[in-house]
Structures are given as structure tokens and as C-alpha cells.
Amino acid sequence: MRRIFLFTGLMISMLSASAQTSVETRRQYLSGHGCDDMVKWNFKCTDGQNSGKWTTIGVPSCWELQGFGTYQYGMRFYGIPKPEGIANEKGYYKYDFYLPAEWQGNQIQLVFEAVMTDAKVKINGRKAGNGLHQGGFYRFVYDVTDRIFFGKHKNTIEVEVSKESENSQVNMAERRADYWNFGGIIRPVFVVAKPVYNIDRVAIDAKMDGRFTADCFLSRGLQAGGKIKTEIVDSKGKVVASNISEVRGNDQTLVDFKVNHPSLWTAETPNLYTAVFTLQDNTGKILHRERQKFGFRTIEYRQHDGVYINGKKVIFKGVNRHSFRPESGRTLSKAKNIEDVKLIKSMNMNAVRLSHYPADPEFLEACDSLGLYVESELSGWHWAHTTIIGQQLVKEMVTRDQNHPSIIFWSNGNEGGFNYELDSEFGRWDKQNRVVLYPWANRNGFETKHYRSWGETLEYMRQPEIFMPTEFLHGLYDGGHGAGLKDYWQIMMHNPRCAGGFLWDLADEGVVRTDLNNIVDCVGNFGADGIVGPHFEKEGSYYTIKEVWSPVQVSASVQGKDIAYTLRNTYNFVNLKDCKFTYRCLELPSWGNSQVKVLKKGNLEAPHVEPGDSSVVVLKNIPASTSAVELTAVDHHGDTIMTWSTKVQPSAAVNSAVASEVSTSETVDELLVKAGERTYYYSKKNGRLEKVMVGGRTISLSNGPRFVAAKRSDRSFDQFYNHDDQDAEKKKTQYTEYVDQGAFHGMTWLDTAAGKTLRVSYDYGTLHHVDYIFQKDGSVRMQAEYDFNGVVDLMGIAFDYPESKVKSKAWVGQGPYRVWQNRLDGPQYGYWQNAYNDPIPGESWEYPEFKGYFAQVDWMQLTTEEGKIGIKAIQNASNIGVYQPRDGRDHILYELPATGISILQVIPAVRNKVNTTDLNGPSAQPYWSTSSKTVVVDLKFD
């Protein structure tokens, strides 16, 4: 034994003499750090675009996005291990590089962050490692110390990458899935130099009470008397604790000591420390120094109860997230990973599921530093890896990521892609022994079932296990996500065993097709599931989620000249006294104007409100002409939580109708009413407005007002679902219009308190009569009365106007996004305007959408090629329909009736890809109309 120690000491001395060896870990990138700074390598692709010749490619990258190979989406080959027509090209990479001469005498490791899918690596003509790595999302490391040159001696790396794995089960697990399949060296490649005697890796467990333990794994055994010095450094660089642990002659050492009063890590308070490990020999000489960031926090999974972090029950407000960008596929950069985390947090989320594979290290670093809880997943979309390959991939995932305090869960595949033999492998490598989830299954104390209806969700929450759906409210096109979230969240938060859930999903997975003139392709309804578009274009649900999941819940009550705000704290760890609140009293523009006046602004004192409690804050002495008051909450990091707008009074005063002098004339087909410079044309066949002439110009508002009503076609008007209807399945996206069976009676003039009134009367039908008072301000007050008894999803009155002539709209009401009956939260009361657009869901992303249903409207003005059409709500008229929302090309969600410009009492709810509309909760239910309604608006034409 003494001879061994003497030999070891002699070897250390020789190495020290032969090179100026740094004690720090050093890294040299052979590729770029990500998609923003790729490095050119020599490259040849065997098939598809630009194949069969040597050229260059940026590394890291997905080669399809660099113009090589064949694009492919996994679902086309779902469930088939070796299908015909699968893109199976290979890529051959070569790159020459040099390493510093002073690195000689170090251990040299070659590191690939991820290669998709099989990788065979050579360094200087010799095989690296075992010659083959399989699995496209994992870091793998080869010791190439005996294969490398230093100084002026060139090194050559060669990599053969197979897009399709030689192992069909790897393809089933990772590539026969509902996402894009790529090929290439998709994450960075670098060389690491460490002293021969080094700390290979550390596994940390730091608890809320300050106990710090770490397993330090050494590159080789060290003679007795060696030590590891551990220093805990805070974010300001101050050493707050230290410890020296003996190395007892083997290759693993346990560090165990206590740190007094550490600042704890949570998603709300992401306090990080750095552990500095210094390896010393028995003379005290420093051999190697390694650094690792971590956080002090304790996770408890309490059976039949919930998840506790640092002793407090936590609710996960989460989303599923792919590593993805349209121009670079799975290859990202540090900046883009940070951008993703900031986007998620901007919606007041606190959690993310890495669907369906481990993310870049930079993403997890951002979750650690900015604050997100993470569920990190082993690949296996609907089929699992074999045990042998799975064991290797679990090891690679867990050993790389286990020290991230943000990781709260591991998951072993997705929706049946489970290899239960791997369950114990996670604990084998994870010092913190986190729970392993099985998304879509009930296992290890968690019920995670996906896409249950609102009613089924109630049933699942009656089970004893912790309920936490790892996917819910599927967000295809403009459905799901925010639509139904408030209903779901209310029942979930009233169940003590619910731990929250994860929406599907963050962003539309649309890829730039270099083979199709650079269009952004979401593959129809497969990839267009995001809360935001491919370039993070915000859809309406973004703002709904932001409001429903706000950690400050606000309700406002206007009390004379004051507003009383009830502030409820739904944080887990933050007191509202650490937030800031500001307000603005606004005078919104009157009908047809655009100036917003700020009458008063200032700060509200942040109340002392602990998590779970509420308090009332009063804003006093609102200026008399205030239309709306905005309240903005800013969190303890300086980020805006939410801005709420409270309507104080209508922006356009509602005056009594005062008739002006009118003159009339007739043709064979029309009654003409001239009021000032405007002439109104009414059909003698049906009494409907046909057009308006303004100073010689025609404004083509026509065919109204007419009664409109529609119901989903898969049920009758008495709310009965016809199970005998074989076409019911396809009808679930269709709407049946109610046809008013009334007959036109005639037009007469009445003398009313307001003056001369034109009445258009109908017999036997739903619409009873329409009255017109032509007013002195140039507008006409229209009062329509109808009576309908039945179940409807849409109901009101409507006009036609050529959509091709519309240029823009402005309004005071909720905005700037449209609403659905089950997605009313998010848009705020204010003055809004936008130009005409007509985006195709999943194919174009121009938001906010021009068309759709708009709530709490005081007035709206359409600017057209012919002039301006104004609508001022007087009674039962605050929902304005502007044509009808467009569905995606596959018509998965709805085929709504054409209602032109409409004034609606009932607006539709929207379904999601999985659940039909009425399965999404109480707010998605149809309306049962049982009495007469009177709609009053002022119309103005300029």
C-alpha cells in the first residue's frame, strides 16, 4: 500500500513539473454556444436537400433548418417502428481544432450536449468512447485524454450522425411523436480540461434548515490525508460558511455541514448560492477546484395532500414547453432560453414541464435564477426506451441536472411511454430522491390524467391521490388555455388534494421550411397548440392566464367618488407589502374620438397581506369625469404582475333621444328617410335597412336589423344530445342557425315622447318591431324588441356589411383582444383600435384579431372605404360581433354562422381540441332564453 501511495505522489510531482496545470476546470467550445453563434464545420448529408456533397454547416443546428435533408413530422409514422418513406438521412461532420499546449497533462473530455439521434464519434481517427451514443436529447461525455494533441498539432473530430436510430425502440420513444423530427448536432460541442486528480461531479442536497450535503465523485482514488474544502458563497460573493472533509482513500467523499440561516430558494424567491469545492492532497496542495450553483430548499411530497416546499403547500401554475424556434428548431441559445423563462413568468406562471425531453442547461439555469418550478422528463412520447438504453439516458439526464433547485419532479416518459424498470434508476442517481411522475397515469401518489372535462376533473379529484394534470385545456388555435381556465381553476383550488396543473402548450411549433420558400409550417392542427405563436405572438389566452393566475387577485367596487379594491394574496411566500401598486384615473374618448386623458395618477400604499389573506385598499376622490381607473401591481422583482381596469361610468354619455326634422320619399321598393345630410333606405319587402347615403356617398350597411340565433349542431334546442344521430360527431364543430319565421307587417310613424319615430313591425316571429328615432346629432337611435324561447349559443341582431371594405375599428370596451363566453377575463376596459386583419390560425399570426366578439363595449366605430359606421350601446348591447372568428384550415374547433356586424346578448363559448364546448365548465354552457329582450343602440354614419 505504501508503494502505491509513493507512486501516486511521484506521478503528481511529474505532472506538475511537466506542465503548468491550472486547478480550474477549463472549457473550449468546438461549436458555437447555440443558434446565435454557430461555428462552421465540414459537412455532407446523404439524402434530401443539398445532399451527396461536402460543404459546410453551422454547429450546433438542426440540419433541416440549414437547408439539408428532409423535413418530417413524427405523427405521420405514429406507431410504426420501421415505416416506408421515413426520412433516414445521415450527416457526416468534420472539424479541425487545436488545444492549448498548457493543457497537456490534464484529463481531456469531449462533451456533446445533444446529437439527434445516433452518434458515432472519432477523434484523430480513433473511436471515442464505446463508439455509439443513442438518444437525441442527452449530454454524453468521452474521455479522450489518450487521443488528443496539444499546441500546434492539429486535432480532427469526425461525427457520423444518423437521423433515425439503429435501435427501433429509440425511434418509437423519441421520433414517432406529435412534434417535428430533426437531425444533427443540435446542441454545443466542447472540450473540458481538468487536472488528472479532479472532482468529476458533485451531487448536492441543501435543505431549508441549512444542512448541506454533497457527494463528491473523484476521477480516481486519492491517497489518505487528502481533503475537500467546501465554501458556500452567496450572490454578493461573500463566503457564508465553509467546511473541510477528509478524502478517505477512495473516489467518493461525503460533505456534510450546516449553514446558518440561509436565504431559501423558491420560484418566488430564487435565492442561489455557489458551492466552491477545492480538492487538496495530503500536503495541502490544491489539485482541482469545482464550482456548482444550488439553492437551499426542502421538497415534501405529502401523501393524499400535496407538494410542500420549505414547509408551505405549493400550487403549480404551469405550462408544457418545447425547446423550439422556427428558424433553428430544437437548437437554441442562452438568450433564447432566458426569453422562454421570462415569457412563462410574464403570464404569472410558476412552473414548466419539459415536454418531452430534457432541456438545455441554460434553460434550467434561467429557471434557477429567475424562479420556475420544473418537471424534467425522460423521452418516451407514447413508447418507452429499452431498459439498457433507458438506464444510460436516465443517468445522463439526472447526473447533469440534479443540482438545479428548480427541478421538483422527474417524469418517466409520457402518456404510456413508460418503462417501469427505470423507476428506481432516478433515485440511484438523484441524491435528492425527487418523486418520479408518469404523465397521464396514476402512480407514485400523483394522478396526472390529461385532458379531462370539467365534470371528469371533479370526479378525478375525489380520488385519494394528489391531482395534478400534466396536460390540460389543449390550446389548439384559439381554443382551450384561457377558455375554461377560470372554471377549472375554481374547482381545482377548492380541492385540498389538487397541486395545480400544466397547460398544453407554450408556443405554436411552426418551423421555417427552407424547402418551401421559408413558410412557417405547423402541419395543420398538429403544431398550432400554443398560447403564443411561433415568434411569441400573443394570443388572447395569454392575457386570460395572466389574470386568472395572477398572484394578486383583485376585485373592485365603485363607491361614489372612491374605489375599494379587495386584494387577495395567492402567493405562497411573498407578502403584498413587498409589491408596489400604482393607479391612473382615465377619461376615455367619447364616441368617435381618440384622446385618452390621464386625470390623476399615483401610488397606493401596499398593504401587509400574508399569503392566503386579503385586505381592502381604498382609492379616494376620483375625478368626476373619470371613465376608468387602472390599477397596476408590480412584484418584488420589479416585474409587472397585472394591470386591471375598472369601469366607473360610460365613456359616451347616454342622452335621451331627441328627434330631428325628417323628410320621406318612396320608390316602388324602398322607403327613404332623410335626416340632415343622411338618407336611410328601408326595404318595403322586409323592413330592413338597405343602405345609408351620406353626402352623396353610399355606406352599405344592410340586411338588418335581423334576429340571429345559433346552437351547436350536436344538440337540440331543448339541450338534449341526440345519441342516435350518427352524424353527431362531425356536428360538434358546426352550428345550426335559427331562421326567424316572422312576416313583415309594415312601417308606420309614431308620435313618442322623443318625437317622430319610425316603427317597423313583424308578425308571428321572433323579432316584434324595430323603432328608429332620427336624432339631431346626426345619429339614429334604434330599438329592437325580440322574444325567443330556447337554448342558444349565440343570439342577438345583425347587419351585413362587405368585409372587403372594412379598414379598421376603434372602440371603448374590453380589449384589445376578442372574448369568448368562457374566456371573458384578460381583456381590460379601455380605448382600443386596430387595423383589419384576418389571420388563419396555425398559418398566420397577426394579433389582436380584428374579427370576433367584443365585450363591455360603450361604443365602436368601423372605418371603411365608404366612410365610418358608429355603434353606441344604450341597452342590452354591450357585446359587439365583428364578423365571425376564423378557424384553422382543419375546422377542428368551430364553423360559426356568418353574422356580419352584430349586437349580441349571447356570444359563443369555445371548445378545445379534446373536449367539446359544453364539457369545459359552467361558463361554456348554452343560454336558455325565456323572455323578450329589448336592444337599444345609437347608429351614426359619417
Language model regions located:
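Substrate-binding clefts and catalytic carboxylate motifs of secreted carbohydrate-active enzymes
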Residues: 33-52, 57-59, 63-66, 88, ...
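Active-site-adjacent substrate/metal-binding segments within catalytic domains
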Residues: 66-123, 128-135, 192-205, 213, ...
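Extended carbohydrate-recognition surfaces in non-catalytic/accessory domains of CAZymes
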Residues: 20-111, 132, 165-178, 182-185, ...
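Accessory beta-strand-rich segments of carbohydrate-active enzymes
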Residues: 23-27, 44-48, 88-199, 235, ...
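Beta-strand-rich binding/interaction modules
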Residues: 121-123, 211-246, 253-255, 275, ...
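Substrate-binding/catalytic cleft of secreted carbohydrate-active enzymes
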Residues: 341-344, 351-540
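An acidic-aromatic loop/edge-strand motif
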Residues: 25, 62-65, 70, 74-79, ...
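Beta-strand/loop-rich accessory regions of lumenal/periplasmic or secreted enzymes
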Residues: 65, 114, 163, 266, ...
